[in-house]
Amino acid sequence: MKALLYSGLLALALAACTTKPEAPKTDLYQEITASDARYDSSLATRLKADEYGMHQYVLAYLKSGPNRSQDSVEAAALQKAHLENIARMAESGKLVLAGPFLDEGEVRGIYIFDVPTVEEARALTETDPAIQAGRLIMELHPWYGSAALPLLTPLHNRLEKKSITN
């Protein structure tokens, strides 16, 4: 019995000695930027980047609207429909960023649209059930930002464990 115990311990000790140690984890920013990144004209063209790597978008501030008197059931239904509308616009590629502000101020959240005009962004915001119900209003502005923003949605999808629309 002792021989069996010693044999088992010896096998574990040998396995521990031969197992490769886990590689140290690198900082994600370093990992992403460590490559010999140079200007990529093909990527710049696909993302509609100008010579500075920038692109024009439309920024929308979602503000509290004049009609916030819905009961909790109706407010929850509007919020669900609002989130489903966000998902639909993101899937179309026209909405590249969306999110709420975490305070209780008048400005409730933002959208960044990848559309050429404020008018097109306005038409998209008018599809939102919360806008239609007057629970939210939009303030729209042309905005100039990184042309890489459309890459956020596919990257986010790799991080999202649970969907906001479920």
Where are these regions (language model features)?
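C-terminal motif of bacterial Sec signal peptides marking the signal peptidase cleavage site
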Residues: 14-16
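Sec-dependent signal peptide recognition
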Residues: 2-8
